[in-house]
């Protein structure tokens, strides 16, 4: 029987816990070439939340195809090293939800779920089509907004550029 790491309630609590962004978060999330891949660039940012663990935002994009990207919210529990993906905001590629047996090729968001863990699939194997972004920048801005990241005070006073 598969081991369930997080219940749906646990996942919801992790998504809604306030995560305070440092003043330099945008520069830290800027993607850069990585030695392990000549096709992708990646940026990462870790935020420690007292008594909860570490949250990691990962921005990954293809150097050639602008529709091939992911903005990921990972979670590392205290005393652990494994990253659990709680949300994944993806570009366009084919995805199949194994339990529902439906496939699509579109922008989509992966959600960590208890039932996919119980079925033995990846924690974030379930996904839904979205029209709330069309670029990597739009995807990670949505991730920050939906997953309760608190922006620095200086940024809050500035109007958001569209």
Label the predicted regions:
Residues 1-64:
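Charge-rich, low-complexity N-terminal segments
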Residues 8, 49-51, 59-61, 88-91, ...:
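Surface-exposed beta-strand edges and flanking loops
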């Amino acid at each position: 029987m598969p081991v369930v790491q997080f219940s749906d309630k646990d996942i919801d609590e992790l998504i809604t816990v306030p995560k305070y962004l440092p003043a330099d978060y945008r520069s830290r999330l800027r993607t850069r070439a990585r030695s392990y891949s000549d096709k992708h660039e990646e940026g990462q940012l870790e935020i420690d939340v007292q008594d909860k663990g570490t949250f990691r935002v990962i921005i990954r994009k293809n150097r050639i195809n602008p529709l091939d990207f992911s903005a990921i919210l990972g979670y590392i529990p205290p005393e652990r090293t494994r990253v659990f993906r709680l949300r994944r905001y993806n570009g366009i590629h084919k995805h199949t939800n194994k339990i529902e047996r439906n496939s699509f090729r579109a922008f989509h968001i992966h959600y960590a779920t208890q039932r996919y863990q119980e079925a033995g699939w990846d924690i974030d194997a379930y996904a839904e089509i979205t029209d709330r972004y069309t670029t990597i920048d739009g995807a990670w801005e949505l991730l920050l907004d939906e997953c309760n990241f608190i922006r620095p005070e200086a940024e809050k006073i500035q109007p958001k550029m569209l």
